[in-house]
Amino acid sequence: MQNKGVVLTLFLVVSMAIVISSTKEKRAVIQKKYVDFKDRKYPWKEECFETCARTFTNGDQSKVSEVVPDYFKCICYVLI
């Protein structure tokens, strides 16, 4: 009977730790930001990725979730 209590307690502690850690990961926010692009009217998507990553994440393209080329600018969706 004591083994069941120990196993149940251990299960509850581990499940609470998983819930707490997953809650912290979900706090990341995607922000919409703008970057001016003066080289051409409508920049290529790769250029927007590079420009957004360089401007907002010190070159880390994995934090840039999406980019939208626009008239002389790039719209960046950045994970903060």
From Swiss-Prot:
Tissue expression summary: Expressed by the venom gland.
Record PTM: Contains 2 disulfide bonds.
Signal peptide: 1-22
UniProtKB keywords: Disulfide bond, Secreted, Signal, Toxin
Molecular function as annotated in GO: toxin activity
Record-stated family: Belongs to the scoloptoxin-15 family.
Protein name: U-scoloptoxin(15)-Er1a
Originating species: Ethmostigmus rubripes
